[in-house]
Amino acid sequence: MLKLAIPKGRLEEKVMTYLKKTGVIFERESSILREGKDIVCFMVRPFDVPTYLVHGVADIGFCGTDVLLEKETSLIQPFFIPTNISRMVLAGPKGRGIPEGEKRIATKFPNVTQRYCESKGWHCRIIPLKGSVELAPIAGLSDLIVDITETGRTLKENNLEILDEIFVIRTHVVVNPVSYRTKREEVVSFLEKLQEVIEHDSNEQSRG
């Protein structure tokens, strides 16, 4: 029995489509659990995917580069799933640039932001937020923000501009290292089927 951690939200539909194309048939489905022959899918928040794998509850999961780097886990990452590419960026009020001295940075990703500031040699005060990070500079809570953007539209709507690109975000297939050892045959077979489906879809799209 393979146990998968599936991120709820924008990735859910794409991941589930790929799973069904590998031949998975779900006999029971709910908002939090989907069960089929020899497979169980836990529907979880994207940030919780690595936690389910690290604690041995799930064997395989799907999550973004942002989550992996924020959580700092040592999961196996065999390949990506094709999705729209987004970026983790440093942004601030248009025309102000990066302030001198201590920088107040609001973000949903404090660990990523801390490492970024250290790499720049900056003295920063990091302000963790759960949502509406773009509001922080407008309200005077922060000088800058570190956040995810795909098109940059939300930043522009809030009179913010990108000051630096920290990294590109992709969707990773991740595997629990213990499961890879103890369920190697099942895990490898599943990954091979999934990769075949992804490659087939990519080839179909490239042919137009």
UniProtKB/Swiss-Prot annotation:
Subcellular location: Cytoplasm
GO biological process entries: L-histidine biosynthetic process
Catalytic activity: 1-(5-phospho-beta-D-ribosyl)-ATP + diphosphate = 5-phospho-alpha-D-ribose 1-diphosphate + ATP
Keywords annotated in UniProt: Amino-acid biosynthesis, ATP-binding, Cytoplasm, Glycosyltransferase, Histidine biosynthesis, Nucleotide-binding, Transferase
Cell division keyword on record: no
Gene Ontology CC terms: cytoplasm
Keyword Zinc-finger: no
Assembly mode: Heteromultimer composed of HisG and HisZ subunits.
Family matches, as HAMAP family: HisG_Short (MF_01018)
Domain notes per entry: Lacks the C-terminal regulatory region which is replaced by HisZ.
PANTHER family reported for this sequence: ATP PHOSPHORIBOSYLTRANSFERASE (PTHR21403:SF8), ATP PHOSPHORIBOSYLTRANSFERASE ATP-PRTASE (PTHR21403)
Name this protein carries in UniProt: ATP phosphoribosyltransferase
Species annotation: Thermotoga maritima (strain ATCC 43589 / DSM 3109 / JCM 10099 / NBRC 100826 / MSB8)
Gene responsible for this protein: hisG
